[in-house]
């Protein structure tokens, strides 16, 4: 065992010396490890059955995912199911803005506090980018970052860590040109946060509501326990960790651009802010990072510490401000304690010992349902942040107050939260005693205010992207785990990384994947590293050009209802429903209806788009929802307007698949309007989730 381990170490070092080409890596393997590879024929390269998996998970909509998402497999079916569900959530929250490209939304339907007319919010953006960076189709993350920085989408509606997310995305794709185009805007936005910087204390402060966490300890106590929706300005671990990470990202991007002065300036800011967080926001008494009050009133006093621990205290680990320093490691005990932050069903945002723990202050006026609060409920938002921080802590050093087995347990607990009565549907917040949703309003279904797939890829599987031509593989599973519910195997396949495809297989005994026992890493299908047991591997990854991002722009998208393009229909003429047919949003979740719905009694219906000017079109995408009273049409035809008449686009007839997007191509046509003529299935109506015309 030791001899073979030593040969593997020599193999890895030899690969590291091999240079920058994939051929050199393969040559190093053959030369450095003859006893490892020559003793017996090499096992075949394992491959997950892509089409079978995607058909099982997504049915008719499998095509959207086929060349986009990395595959995942493990001995835990709940982790598997939630992993694929979260990509479905990602797909549902992609809103096409037409010429501005794609963004990720937080809510599927509209809410009153979103940024109009885009339906964007910036508080969960870092999660959206962290998930989207792992797609082989780089357009979604790229468009979103361009919107945020080049189109003013980062309006500081809430506190944010978007520059840090851009750096995390760069580590995966190494597209320096795209990243550096955003650098001036990153610096500008960072400077705007001076309006929340106390120069005497050297720290940022924020109102909890604008930290996307209303009804926290600071805001409730600042009201004397009477409210907490507004107020409670405080120096918080959240905004200071965000700004630390954003400054570090800007410093690194500036260095990449060769701007040494800016790199040094922001590096100095990083060190100053880190020092102030460690000096001022760490509480020896509470053994935790805490808020200090900015506000001073009859109930609380400036610079005093808040009186209870909150989950937000783990954010210095989430954003790399600290790693495995022993002084702070005891804080992790609080999420393991059932009477502290470790609730039976999930991580509490505040401890039960707090006087106003789980007291309900706010209700929805229309329904009387409970509204959002952060005084104890489980929030997937902060659960994601804490698990990211825990992954960073465990990757930085050996187990201490908390270990790798805890990461797997907490990830599994979080995965279980995605289920409602056996059905996958992540909502806003949950009761930590029961695991049941609290808010439960229509807007809450399939809520994209958190991450999960990044926790699987970079945390559980341990794919740590690097700034150089390498990748660190360090799965967060305990070595020599013999527990009954251990993860006996897992795989991630076709992960885009530095222009290549990275795959990782772990099989405890080699039986499941019928190949190598232990951990194996493949680059573009070739084995580049392995070891017989779990542990860290540093693998060279010679960079390759990324595929060019293709950006077709749908000319049918309508963001403002009163502007062109404008929809009309033969029935179902409610303005909101009509607009949903061309608003750039496509999803097939039945809990939240989306799209134009026919209401006519006859089988033949139509939906038309008036562009208000001549446009040239060559392609269409049609997305039909099926379920309940709705079915995909029996057939359809596309027509275009010419000389005041509707004329057929030839050969465009067929039976589209339900709950999927179908592409239709045709010879270029110049027109001012297009009409979709539908023959409905007997006894059913049609819901057109979206028609896009290119």
Kindly give the residue locations of the regions a language model identified.
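Bacterial Sec-dependent signal peptides at the C-terminal "C-region" and cleavage site
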Residues: 37-44
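Non-catalytic carbohydrate-binding regions of carbohydrate-active enzymes
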Residues: 162, 257-295, 329-499
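Trp- and acidic/polar-enriched beta-sheet ligand-binding modules for extracellular glycan
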Residues: 602-603, 629-694
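Disordered, acidic Ser/Thr/Pro-rich linker "stalks" and the adjacent N-terminal cap
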Residues: 540-614, 623-632, 651-660, 690-694
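Catalytic cores of carbohydrate-active enzymes
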Residues: 44-49, 53-66, 70-74, 80-85, ...
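Acidic/His metal-coordination segments adjacent to aromatic residues that form catalytic metal sites
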Residues: 108-111, 141-150, 212-235, 298-300, ...
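Active-site acid/base region of carbohydrate-active enzymes
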Residues: 77-98, 115-118, 122-123, 157, ...
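Substrate-binding groove/exosite segments of carbohydrate-active enzymes
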Residues: 48, 53-187, 290, 304-321, ...
